[in-house]
Amino acid sequence: MTAESYAVLCERLIAVAVAVSCLEYLVRPDFLGDGGLASWSVGRLSRSWKTGPWGGVLDAVLAPSRNRLQLLFRLVAAVVLVLPGDWPVPRTVALAIVVAGALLAQVRSSYGHDGADQMCLIVAGGLLVGRVFSAPEPALWFIACQAGLAYATAGLKKLASPVWRSGAALPGVMSTTIYGQERAYQLVAQRPWLARLGCFTVISFESTFPLALLGSPPLTLLLLGTGFCFHVSNALTMRLNTFFWAFVATYPAIVFVAL
């Protein structure tokens, strides 16, 4: 496979992440509405420039009804990227729409964004630059290094936390309303050794993930396989659907760089 082929594969995977994210917002319009948790009427008050001279322009784009239209544009762009075939101009335009939408989402609200949103922006942005300058190899290197940095940062931050080191983090997360699941909570709450093992496994995997870039095929495949299973389990237990696609979208870049 060529660098272009790996880049297109990254595009298709990140497009699925974008499509899932857009659909999650579109099926819950109240969340982004004026009375929702991510209300623009409240979010625009977080920064003075959002209500200053640029306020009218932002209102025209980020008000609830127009924001839904923007989400639909992003969804259509994601579908274009998923479709078979490598049409340079349509795919470049679609990537630009995805990146612009991700940036507008960051402007609209300072809250509610997670690592998947950031990874979508990083991957799509890197691929867009690669498209514009016909430079897929630097784009793939950028994405692979960003993935290694993201995993390592998450792992080292957990390592520094006594809550994670003690094993209390897993029962704590599984008991929450947003990310929790009753059966998973009971499983780790009643078996402290399993909770500690789970926390240690996550810390070890995330902290050592940059080793996937060293060029050792067995190690790279082991870490990518572990990452795949890790994100599948998170999607099933914590409903982190976008995380799976956003982070797995970096794996073709890692394969290109390391193998």
Task: Give residue ranges: language-model regions.
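Alpha-helical membrane-anchoring segments
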Residues: 1-259
